[in-house]
Amino acid sequence: MSQQHRVRRAALAMVAVAAVACATLGVLAGLGVWKPQGSFVGSWSAATNPLASTVPNPADSFTSDVGHDKAPHRQRVRMQPSQFDAVASPKKLRGTPWANITVQADGIRTMIGNRITWIGYFRSLPHYDGNISLENISGLIADSPTPDWLRETDPGVFLLKVGIVQSPGTTMTVAAPRVQELRMAANPYVYVAGVSSTGIFRGVKVTSWLPATNAPDPDPLHRRPFISYDGVGARLDTIDSDFSFLGSDSSEAYGVSWGTNTTGQSLRSVFHDNLFGAYTGRAVNVTFQNSVFRNNAVYGLDPHSDSRGLTIIGNEAYGNNTHGIIFSKGVVGSVIANNHSHDNGANGIMMDELSSNNVIQNNVVERNHGGGIVIQGSSNVQVTNNVVAGNTLGIRVNGNELGIAATNRITGNQLSGNYNGIKVYGGARDTALAHNVVRDTVNTGMVLSEPTTSQSDTVINAQKGVMVRHGASTLTGLSVQQSARGVVLADGTTATIAGAQLDTRDVGIDVHDAATVTLAGANTTTITGARKGLVVSGMANLSNVTMDKVAKGVVLSPAGRLSVEDGRIAAQDVGLEVQGLGGSDRIVLHNSDLRATDPVAGASLADVSSNKLTATMSWLAIAGATFVALALILHLLHRMFAPMSSVRHRGTPQPAHSGA
């Protein structure tokens, strides 16, 4: 090979190497792995916002047509006389046919109306040990003129046909092994009630009973029997017991009730198929622990009317026609923790009507047909570290005409698979969200329709990450990932966003309906991957913002106004697109860097001296350049090796071909 050929081949090899390098860089640039010096790569980010107008407001009396019977229409009746009048106001019973057994410290009185018909004394029992028990009462009644009022029908099974009322200071036990089941005839004025007294149910089954059918009464609209304790010093304990098919819609007759000033506990008990599973009204320091509230006609567990100091821990509420657990009308100073409320017809856990200063923590609330956790007309509620999944609405906070909702704290909750995640509306004030994670929301991650602060909340996989409407909200450290839209502002709202990370498919931040957004703070807000980084038809004040891997950086509508300070926008197509007339007088751009195929489209900026506008190659141009470089490489490689073959054969005689 001649010297000339060697030089030629070396030169061609150098050109080929250079072409390969250029093509490689072009491919890397097209993939976003490498950028020319002076460009920037924004950090990963995410943010979301949904249109609140699409978010339903679940009715608090919601009933499901799947998996739940229709909740009975409330037909409240007022019992006259009440179950307590035999002790408190016997004159009210005058002339009535209602019968009851009044339990006193020394014995019992049988009564019809206000008239005593018979008296029995416990000391007459052959084996009386000083304790008042259901079997002792039955033993006395057996010697009365009305022995069928309470009798043992089978071993351990007792049938009660009238009311039992305990007088103040008495303690009555209904307990295994002597009592296995208490059947209460499904007639009006059949009950077990205590006035400033104690009732203990241990290891027993208590239910309504229809002698004609030899079965419990399944109809919650009937005047079914109930259990209720009331008065200063009253106590009701239910331990390892089952209460079913009890309750009617009358004051403290809902099933099993802890009334005014009553304390006590429910441990490892089951409340099912009652009107309300269990109820408290003005009760004090009652504990419900490791119990089950299921398939009740209205509520599972209903603390009510100024009850206070309650502990609701380790329970399960499911299959109830409305709410699983509801605090209503001034229930305060209580804790709901480590419960599982699921598959109820309305809300899983609810605070209602001034039920304030309560704690809801470490619960699992799932598959309810309304809200998972609802704070309605209640204040100073701490909602912390709950798992809320598969509900119509995950967590909602709202005021109404019955009470304001103020200074509620929603912190560290895990929400997933809800139609909407968190919603704040209806006059709620000073709500604070922090460190919540909202995943796989069908519609919107968070809807903030009242002034709210959000600190380090995360939305993953939603149609809209965060929807801000009305008032002024602040979002700090927000992260939105794998969502179509990041933050949407509407209805004249004002929002401040700082240090957000918005990784969206369609729009990073959408400002419309005369809304105003301010991006500020020491930490950079980053918008990544969106078709449009920022769409403005209201007012946008941007400071310390980065947009990267977006098709268009900022789209300014004819009604929009824009101010950018220290912005960094790297777009594939357009850095700033100005729609309509008079763009320059609606834009203030200072100390910013716009890099795009077309840095500014639709208007001329009045002053660009402090900004850096860089036109870059489009992805189509990069692809074309890469194709040309590869074609050149193939051509050069062909030129490098093809001449060697031609030199080898030049001047060499061709071999002769012999004939056939």
Where are these regions (language model features)?
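Sec-dependent N-terminal signal peptides of Gram-positive bacterial secreted proteins and lipoproteins
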Residues: 20-23
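Extended amphipathic alpha-helical coiled-coil/heptad-repeat regions
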Residues: 349, 368-380, 384-391, 399, ...
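Extracytoplasmic/lumenal ectodomains and periplasmic regions of secretory and membrane proteins
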Residues: 556-602
